[in-house]
UniProtKB/Swiss-Prot annotation:
Coiled coil stretches, renumbered: 893-940, 974-1026, 1075-1141
Note, other: The receptor-mediated activation of PLC-beta-2 is most effectively mediated by one G-protein alpha subunit, alpha-16.
UniProt biased composition (Polar residues): 850-869
Active site: H327, H374
Quaternary assembly: Interacts with RAC1. Forms a complex composed of at least WDR26, a G-beta:gamma unit, and PLCB2.
Protein's UniProt name: 1-phosphatidylinositol 4,5-bisphosphate phosphodiesterase beta-2
The keyword Secreted belongs to this UniProt entry's keyword annotation: no
Length: 1181
């Protein structure tokens, strides 16, 4: 856009609109009809009507959402009003006199203003021209000066009965600070009392501007003005203004030949337009006040106006565009109990949406009219034909490009489906595309037609029955499938499908059946989760012939795989994904997803669990090239705000052309790229939030948030200013550093959001603008509401600077190559400072032949080949100075504090586990000993018969078992044997459980330790790479400094050799050229060396990580081997423990020991201590 010739002019108000027309305004609720005169102010800001008592009502044109005439306008329902308008008379022609104006803050909260004209067809002209004013791109994208002018127009229109401006209107217009309003009125010598009034003649535009300057002074603009005007002079000459425009307001990336800078004679036009002083205009001077209004003018719009018009190529295939899409369009609130309304289809289409959704269900008797509702919820119903009628009315009011109707068809009645098809044919008429275009047949490999080819057409997205004859519908839960089509429904004999096509469809059906069989193996919870994510979309029925015949270029098919889709190569097939499924595909196969969207279309919609109608962020799916990213238009949250803001561009057509890399099949695009994208120049964006104006109706502290939406590799940081120093919402100033987004990889996919918040995080206003639509320089940013409506008062004053991204390493070299003369002249000025650093300079300039002077003063050129040796030496020297970086070894990583601490904790856990196991083992043995003692005591009571004079003595457990003389020594009590077997079994189980616990705990420890080592290794390696990069940058800068010092040495030596000015200039140019080549060569060599070192470093780091991962398998194998060895010897250990513990109680099991009877000896049998065996078992475990 040229600075002096804005592309877009403000809307033109036709004379008859400003002159006015007589109407009758009626209200159905009150049954009142009032004669009014309807007008539009000459500047097109307000639609207003005046009653007979001179009372006036206003409607801001920016709030108008629709105008309707004839049968689409509201019709009185009150009998009283019907009698007033003689509606019962057949020759009344009432519909030719109607006019309805629809306005509201969003798409749900609407107000209808109804008028009836005295003449026929008057309402038609008013409806068309008023809507054209409301939808004009400059109505909501007007410059700051226009919004300030709207305030003046409204003040002058709201007059009291005496024809004067009430002062109280000023207080209502600027409610934030009444005292400041009074002071500003006083400064302009105007009345300031609450009950006073001002004569409109005393308040012209010049006085109004003075009032604004007093109410909202702009010290920040005064500072800018001071930095460019002549010292001690209160004005800026046209030369100074030209310099300011070319340096600050001009995009530095523009080519000076194709886009020449401003010239003083052109700038004089701006001074004539904005300078309030006539004397200054004659002298070509601009005052500070003129500077303020210049920065508020259309020449300094923050937007590139040409992007608001249709400026993109609209002849590409349909799948090469992002398409503004809606989900569950009929709902006005939540997904469970919200109201449904046909009006939502009008509002969504008027906002620029080109894809709407219709959830169709079978109507109930007796009418059996198909309905639209959200199935299995408490949402209300609307008739299908009402929705179709609304779409037919509003489809092409704001955009001529094709509309896609996305049917979610649950109507399993052939008769009702036929009725749906008939409604579409009759109401849409010629706009309904029923047959493919001749040049774009439905064949594999044939691309889709373009939006231009489909201009003014409506396309149906519905399941298509690919074969002739009806297909039986699938049963929904609790329903019964109906029979075949009735005879009244025609069936085509030839559907145009070849045998190859039928085979492909059969293959898809087989795959779908296999997937359904696999889904049958899922548990109930997984099936419920899948159904809740998809909502009712998975319950669609099969299309019958009538509806199927309407489907052509948008044929929904169940997604199978990217490979399958690529093999079939059918551009007319579209698949729908929930946000979760799309995110999964994007995460696992992002590049395949992008390639899929190059060939055919995809639709993404919110998951079924978003019962509050909230939205997901659409940016991630735009990054993958998904065309129809459907959102809930009734919820104006941040995702919807971004969608509304971006689709406002390209003429609000609902179609945005994707980037070339997302369209060309020979190019690969990875949305997760973090480095660079081939051939795409990254952008650096810097934004400084300077001040705000009229941000709130209350005196509060405010702050500003700045956020970037784009690729995952873009800078994702959200910046925020501090709170304004004082509670001042009229003109707060933030003196902070600029917010910099250093590397925006693909500017075409990025957008900037700037939001103003009140203290306490209350939303005040925001703006979302694509990066490619921004202009560099100082700009006033007019804010929008949450529903993207233009706000009259609030604005921000910002400074934007956009330039091509250049790494710091190449910054100096880029400047030198872009403007070598300017760069080296600047370096010459630094030579004096460097002279003391460089020390004594050599007498000879090069190592070859010295420069000499002839007797006549003519210079002699330096020896041949003097540049190359220096360049080579410097490059080698730079390469030698770069040391090869090292990475941490495996041993060093093992000694890291975090790893050692974790190992100690694991060792402690293992010791505790083994201690508990040993204690349990000991308890089992002691319990067995106690049970054995009890058995032997019982046996002793039956068999022992002590003598008369015998003395009672305490015996050990084994002594209590007395063997009778007739009883063999090798026979034992069977209960004792049973006790022994049970004890061995319990010990066996305890040992197995203990060994398994140890193995499981060791495996867990190995996993945790390896994960910890991997985490610390990655952190350390990231720090190593960062240090390496910082060191590399430092080395490069030092090398450049050395080369610069060397250049200065050569120039100093040259001046000593010859005094001829011409020769000096020539030799100086040679030295500078040589220096540039030398720097380029040295930087190239150093960069190659650094890249090699970085590759080696990354290879070592990768090898280290692989070693750590290999350790996990080794440790687990070792733990498993130990476990298997212990389990193998457990049985023998158990028997040995039992035998050793009770060896004297089971004499038959003692190895190589003679049988002995306790009866034969009076001595006690020896008993092993219990604790010693338990200790042995603990040490073994």
């Amino acid at each position: 856009m040229s600075l002096l010739n804005p592309v877009l002019l403000p809307p033109n108000v036709k004379a008859y609109l400003s002159q006015g027309e007589r109407f009758i305004k009626w209200d159905d609720e009150t049954s009142i009809a009032s004669p009014v005169i309807l007008r539009v102010d000459p500047k097109g800001y307000y639609l207003y009507w005046t009653y007979q008592n001179q009372e006036m009502e206003f409607l801001d044109v920016t709030s108008i959402r629709d105008t309707r005439f004839g049968k689409f306008a509201k019709i009185p329902k009150s009998q009283k009003l019907r009698e007033v308008f003689n509606m019962d008379f057949p020759d009344n022609h009432f519909l030719l006199k109607t006019l309805t104006v629809v306005s509201g803050p969003d798409m749900v909260d609407l107000t209808f203003y109804n008028f009836v004209s005295y003449k026929e067809n008057v309402g038609k002209d008013w409806a068309e021209d008023v809507l054209a004013l409301a939808k004009h791109p400059m109505t909501v994208n007007a410059p700051r000066s226009t919004f300030l002018d709207k305030i003046l127009v409204k003040l002058k229109m709201q007059l009291n009965p005496e024809g004067k401006i009430p002062v109280k209107n000023f207080f209502q217009m600027f409610p934030a600070d009444r005292k400041r309003v009074e002071a500003a009125l006083g400064a302009c010598h105007l009345a300031k009392g609450k009950n006073d009034a001002i004569n409109p003649e005393d308040f012209p535009e010049s006085v109004y501007k003075s009032f604004l300057m007093s109410l909202c002074p702009r010290p920040e603009i005064d500072e800018i003005f001071t930095s460019y005007h002549s010292k001690a002079k209160p004005y800026m000459t046209k030369e100074h203004l030209t310099k300011f425009i070319n340096q600050k307001q001009r995009d530095p990336r523009l080519n000076s030949l194709l886009f020449p800078p401003a010239r003083p004679e052109q700038v004089q036009v701006l001074i004539d337009k904005y300078e309030p002083s006539g004397i200054n205009v004659q002298r070509g001077q601009l005052s500070p006040e003129g500077m303020v209004w210049f920065l508020c003018g259309p020449e300094n719009s923050v937007l590139a106006h040409d992007t608001l018009l249709i400026h993109q190529d609209m002849t590409q295939p349909l799948n090469h565009y992002f398409i503004n899409s809606s989900h569950n369009t009929y709902l006005t609130a939540g997904q469970f109990s919200g109201l449904s309304s046909a009006e939502m289809y009008r509002q969504v289409l008027l906002s620029g949406c080109r894809c709407v959704e219709l959830d169709c269900w079978k109507g109930k008797p007796p009418d059996e009219e198909p309905i639209i509702t959200h199935g299995f919820t408490m949402t209300t119903d609307i008739l299908f034909k009402e929705a179709i009628e609304a779409i037919a009315e509003s489809a092409f009011k704001t955009s001529p490009y094709p509309v896609i109707l996305s049917f979610e068809n649950h109507v399993d009645s052939p008769r009702q489906q036929a009725k749906m098809a008939e409604y579409c044919r009759s109401m849409f008429g010629e706009t309904l595309l029923t047959d493919p275009l001749e040049n774009f047949p439905l064949k594999p490999g044939i691309p889709l037609p373009s939006p231009e080819d489909l201009r003014g057409k409506i396309l149906i997205k519905n399941k298509k029955n690919q074969f002739s004859g009806p297909a039986s519908p699938s049963k929904k839960p609790g329903g019964v499938a109906e029979g075949s089509l009735p005879s009244s429904v025609p069936v085509e004999e030839d559907t145009g499908w070849t045998a190859e096509d039928r085979t492909e469809v059969e293959e898809e059906e087989v795959v779908e059946e296999e997937e359904e069989e696999e889904s049958g193996n899922l548990d109930e919870e997984e099936i419920k989760k899948m159904q809740s994510d998809e909502g009712t979309a998975g319950l669609e029925v099969t299309a019958y012939e009538e509806m199927s015949s309407l489907v052509n270029y948008i044929q929904p098919t169940k997604f199978i795989s990217f490979e399958f889709s690529a093999q079939k190569n059918r551009s007319y097939v579209v698949s729908s994904f929930t946000e979760l499924k799309a995110y999964e595909l994007l995460s696992k196969a992002s590049m395949q997803f992008v390639d899929y969207n190059k060939r055919q279309m995809s639709r993404v919609y919110p998951k079924g669990t978003r019962m509050d109608s909230s939205n997901y962020m659409p940016q991630m799916f735009w990054n993958a090239g998904c065309q129809m990213v459907a959102l809930n238009f009734q919820t104006m949250d941040l995702p919807m705000q971004q969608n509304m803001a971006l689709f406002e561009f390209n003429g609000q057509s609902g179609y945005l052309l994707k980037h070339e890399f997302m369209r060309r099949l020979d190019k690969q695009f990875n949305p997760f790229s973090v480095d660079r994208i081939d051939v795409v120049v990254a952008t650096t964006l810097s934004i400084t939030i300077i001040s705000g104006q009229f941000l709130s109706e209350r005196s509060v502290r405010t702050y500003v948030e700045v956020e970037l939406f784009g690729l995952p590799g873009d800078p994702k940081r959200r910046y925020r200013t501090k709170l304004s120093p004082t509670a001042n919402s009229i003109n707060p100033v933030w003196k902070e550093e600029p917010f910099i987004f250093e590397k925006i990889l693909m500017p075409e996919l990025a957008s900037l959001r700037i939001a103003v918040m009140e203290e306490g995080s209350k939303f005040l206003g925001h703006r979302i603008i694509p990066i490619n639509a921004l202009h560099s320089g100082y700009h006033h940013l007019c804010l929008r509401s949450e529903s993207n409506m233009a706000l009259t008062m609030p604005a921000l004053f910002v400074f934007l600077e956009m330039k091509d991204y250049i790494p710091d390493t190449w910054a100096d070299l880029t400047v030198a190559l872009a403007n070598p003369i300017k760069y080296f002249n600047a370096q010459d000025k630094k030579s004096v400072k460097l002279k003391g650093v460089t020390g004594s300079l050599p007498e000879k300039l090069f190592s070859g032949t010295p420069v000499a002077s002839q007797s006549n003063g003519a210079p002699v050129s330096a020896g041949n080949g003097s540049t190359a040796p220096g360049t080579k030496a410097t490059g080698e020297e730079a390469t030698k100075e770069v040391t090869e970086p090292q990475t941490a070894s495996l041993e060093e990583l093992r000694e890291l504090k975090g790893v050692v601490k974790l190992q100690r904790r694991h060792e402690k856990e293992l010791r505790e586990l083994e201690r508990r196991g040993a204690r349990r083992w000991e308890e089992l043995l002691q319990r067995g000993a106690a049970q054995l003692a009890e058995l032997q005591t019982q046996a002793a009571g039956c068999k022992l018969r002590p003598g008369k004079g015998s003395r009672k003595k305490r015996t050990l457990p084994c002594e209590e078992t007395v063997v009778a003389p007739s009883e063999p020594h090798d026979r034992a009590d069977p209960r004792v044997q049973e006790l022994k077997d049970r004890l061995e079994q319990e010990l066996q189980q305890q040992g197995e459980e203990q060994y398994r616990s140890v193995l499981k705990r060791k495996e867990q420890h190995v996993t945790e330790q390896i994960a910890k080592m991997m985490e610390l290794a990655r952190e350390k390696q990231a720090a190593e790479l960062k240090t390496f990069k910082e060191t590399s940058e430092t080395d490069t800068k030092e090398m450049k400094k050395k080369l610069e010092a060397k250049r200065l040495e050569r120039i100093q030596a040259m001046t000593k050799v010859t005094t001829d000015k011409v020769a000096q200039e020539r030799l100086k140019r040679e030295i500078n050229n040589s220096h540039i080549q030398e720097v380029v060569q040295a930087v190239k060599q150093m960069t190659e060396t650094l890249e090699r070192h970085q590759e080696k470093l990354e290879e070592r780091q990768t090898a280290c990580l692989e070693q750590i991962q290999a350790m996990e398998k080794q440790f687990q194998e070792k733990a498993l081997a130990e476990y298997e060895a212990k389990m193998k010897g457990l049985e023998a250990e158990v028997k040995e423990s039992v035998r050793a513990y009770f060896k004297d109680c089971f004499p038959t099991e003692a190895e190589d020991k003679p049988e002995r009877s306790c009866e034969a000896s009076e001595e006690s049998c020896p008993q092993e201590p219990l604790v010693s065996k338990a200790d042995t078992q603990e040490s073994r475990l």
